[in-house]
Regions:
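Short amphipathic alpha-helical segments that mediate assembly, nucleic-acid/protein binding
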Residues: 3-6, 55, 79, 101, ...
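Generic alpha-helical transmembrane segments
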Residues: 68-84, 109, 144-148
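Alpha-helical membrane-associated segments of multi-pass integral membrane proteins
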Residues: 14, 24, 112-160
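Perimembrane helix-loop junctions in membrane proteins
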Residues: 31-45, 85-98, 120-127, 154-165
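Cytosolic juxtamembrane helix and N-cap/initiation of the first transmembrane helix
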Residues: 1-41, 157-165
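Membrane-interface helix-boundary signature
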Residues: 6-16, 20, 60-70, 92-102, ...
Length: 165
C-alpha cells in the first residue's frame, strides 16, 4: 500500500512541477522580452499628464541601478530555477523523488520580489487615485501568492512521498 501511495504522491508532485515549469517559462519569456525596456527606460513614457507630479520620481526609480540589477538577477535566477525544474521533472517522470531546492528557491525569489516592491516602489498618486500604488501592491502580492501554489504543492507531495518510503 505504501508503494502505491508514494507513486501517487510523486505523480502529484510531477503534475504540480509541470504547472510551475510552464508558469516559470512564461514568466521568463516575458522577463526577457521586457528586459530591454527595463535596462533602457523611455523617459517620454513618464509624462506628468499620466503620472502627475510623480512622473520624475517614477522615471528615476525605473532608471535606477537597483531596478536594473534586480531585473538582470531575476532573469538569471529564473533561468536557474527553470533548469532545476526540468531536471526535477525528469526524475519525477521516472518515479524518483527529487530535491526541493527549485521550489524553495522559487518561493524565496517570490518573497524577495514582494519585499523589494514594498520597500522601493515609490508612493504615487495618478489622476486622483491616491491609493493606486497600494492597490497595485495588493493585486501583485495576490498574483504572486497564486503563482507560489504549485511550488508549495510540489513540496507538500514530495514530503508525503518521503514519509511513505
Amino acid at each position: 500500500m505504501k508503494t502505491k501511495d508514494k507513486k501517487n504522491y510523486l505523480k502529484k508532485a510531477k503534475n504540480w512541477n509541470m504547472v510551475l515549469l510552464v508558469l516559470k517559462a512564461l514568466g521568463l519569456l516575458t522577463s526577457i522580452v521586457g528586459l530591454r525596456g527595463v535596462l533602457n527606460p523611455d523617459k517620454s513614457l513618464y509624462t506628468e499628464a499620466v503620472y502627475g507630479s510623480s512622473a520624475t520620481q517614477l522615471y528615476e526609480q525605473a532608471n535606477s541601478i537597483g531596478t536594473k540589477a534586480y531585473a538582470v538577477i531575476g532573469v538569471i535566477i529564473s533561468i536557474t530555477i527553470l533548469i532545476m525544474l526540468i531536471s526535477a521533472h525528469k526524475k519525477l517522470k521516472e518515479g524518483v523523488p527529487t530535491a526541493k531546492t527549485p521550489y524553495y528557491l522559487h518561493l524565496f525569489w517570490i518573497v524577495t520580489g514582494i519585499i523589494y516592491s514594498l520597500l522601493f516602489t515609490p508612493k504615487i498618486e495618478i489622476q486622483g487615485f491616491t491609493e493606486f500604488a497600494s492597490m497595485i501592491s495588493i493585486v501583485s502580492i495576490g498574483l504572486q501568492a497564486l503563482v507560489s501554489l504549485p511550488a508549495i504543492f510540489s513540496i507538500i507531495y514530495l514530503f508525503k512521498a518521503e514519509t511513505e518510503a
